[in-house]
A protein has these predicted regions:
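Positively charged, Gly/Ser-enriched RNA/tRNA-binding surfaces
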Residues: 19-37, 48-49, 83-96, 102-155, ...
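Hydrophobic mid-domain F-helix/FG-region of cytochrome P450s
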Residues: 145-152, 166-176
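Extended alpha-helical scaffolds
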Residues: 153-157, 165-168, 181, 195
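Short, structured secondary-structure boundary patches
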Residues: 54-68, 179-183, 203, 282-285, ...
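Beta-rich nucleic-acid/ligand-interaction surfaces
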Residues: 46-62, 163-173, 268-276, 373-377
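Acidic, His- and aromatic-enriched active-site or binding-groove loops in soluble protein domains
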Residues: 64-70, 177-199, 206, 258
Length: 406
């Protein structure tokens, strides 16, 4: 048989038994957390019309989206993001619902990663969207919920980097850069590529004094005192509003008791271009990339016909699992509660006993034709916790302590 029959496409992965159990456990923990925080779960189709994500202002890079066609030749897209479908629902199916809307989801997304990246093409994302609330308190709630999500999942060491898109935009206004130039600067700032940034600002003929201050942007990283440093760099009103907003969010997060998790990073500017205010990402030393990200996207809902402020975050379950593995967690395949030897002669007695135990919440795995020795071996090798068999019409259970069938 060809080896290719056993291969899966690049960027995809299988999830085996033990990890699958752990994933479902985490998903249920998050569902409970989101629900108890007032968020209602939605599901959106894996296929949407491509135009849903092809917005000229807030859309996705065409090269990152999986596309196909329906029978009428219309272009479809495999969902690369969960925020835009949630906004679509809020602006259509939920148009009559009063604000604020609190929506959550746990579902897959798929997108081509950047060239040379080892990222998965398909991943499961859990997240929340809080629409209709503009205050810094709403932003703080979303960030606190992201932190609580990582805690609930069992991640021990992580931090949240907090930034503000408006601070970067204000600086770009002051520099007088075009949108194309701004995007190039954004990439250099995000990558902390100081040399490339310096050379590019010189190429764009940015005035020396402004360029000197811009060069400090990637270095605005640390505790709350960074905000005072930032305010000393510019008098731009947009920048000042951004730093004030972050101070308000930090104050609220202190009341949540989560201030210790937060670092300020004003050089963080997400590639996803629908963010309009505060942005954040969750990182851990166990991974080379963020496992969650989010922020405020007040301009996005209006593009779909319902103008309203909005904020939210998405957490990659796949990256969370990788982080748990890196911190030493293992996912052994779950052992059966009971292995029950079954033959045709004792089938009725075996089925009645198994059904009773299952009603009691005990897992029963039927083993057809297994001998008593084979059943005992399954227990001794960890494949099952206990063993049972049918003898003379009665179910007998193996006692490991007494080495006998009872």
């Amino acid at each position: 048989m060809s080896v290719k029959r056993f291969q899966i496409p690049e960027g995809m992965q299988d999830t085996l038994m033990g990890q699958c159990v752990r994933v479902r456990c985490v998903e249920q923990q998050l569902r409970t957390l989101f629900s108890r925080s007032g968020f209602a779960e939605i599901q959106t189709p894996i296929l949407e019309y491509y135009r849903t994500f092809d917005d000229e202002v807030y859309g996705f890079d065409d090269h990152h989206v999986w596309k196909t066609f329906d029978r009428q030749g219309r272009v479809l897209a495999v969902r690369p993001d969960n925020t835009i479908p949630a906004v679509r629902i809020a602006a259509s199916r939920l148009m009559g619902e009063p604000l604020p809307l609190r929506l959550c989801y746990i579902q897959n997304v798929a997108a081509f990663p950047a060239e040379g990246s080892s990222s998965l093409c398909e991943s499961t994302q859990a997240g929340v969207e809080l629409m209709g609330e503009k205050s810094a308190l709403a932003d703080a709630e979303v960030i606190a919920l992201a932190i609580r999500s990582l805690q609930e999942a069992g991640l021990k060491e992580f931090q949240i980097d907090l930034g503000q898109v408006a601070f970067f935009k204000g600086f770009m206004q002051e520099a007088g850069l075009t949108p194309a130039q701004t995007e190039t600067v954004r990439r250099y700032v995000e990558d902390k590529n100081m040399l490339a940034l310096q050379l590019y600002l010189r190429e764009c003929a940015v005035p020396g004094e402004v360029s000197k201050r811009l060069m400090k942007l990637p270095q605005l990283y640390g505790d709350e005192t960074v905000l005072d440093e930032a305010e000393a760099l510019t008098a731009n009103s947009l920048c000042r509003e951004a730093t004030l907003n972050l101070k308000q969010i930090l104050s609220a997060l202190d009341d949540y008791g989560y201030g210790e998790y937060i670092s300020i990073d004003l050089g963080m500017v997400h590639a996803v271009n629908y963010y309009s205010g505060m942005i954040f990402r969750g990182i851990t030393g166990h991974l080379g990339r963020p496992l969650l990200s989010g922020g405020r996207y007040d301009g996005l809902p209006a593009r779909y016909g319902r103008a309203m402020p909005a904020t939210g975050f998405g957490l990659s379950i796949n990256l969370l699992m990788a982080a748990l593995i890196s911190q030493g967690e293992t996912f052994p395949a779950p052992a059966a509660g009971f292995v029950l030897g079954v033959s045709r002669q004792g089938l009725r007695a075996a089925l009645d006993w198994a059904e009773q135990k299952r009603r009691e919440g005990i897992n029963i795995s039927l083993q057809y034709g297994a001998s008593k020795a084979e059943l005992v071996q399954m227990v001794e090798t960890g494949r099952a916790e206990k063993a049972a068999c049918v003898t003379e019409g009665k179910v007998r259970v193996w006692s490991g302590e007494e080495k006998a069938w009872k």
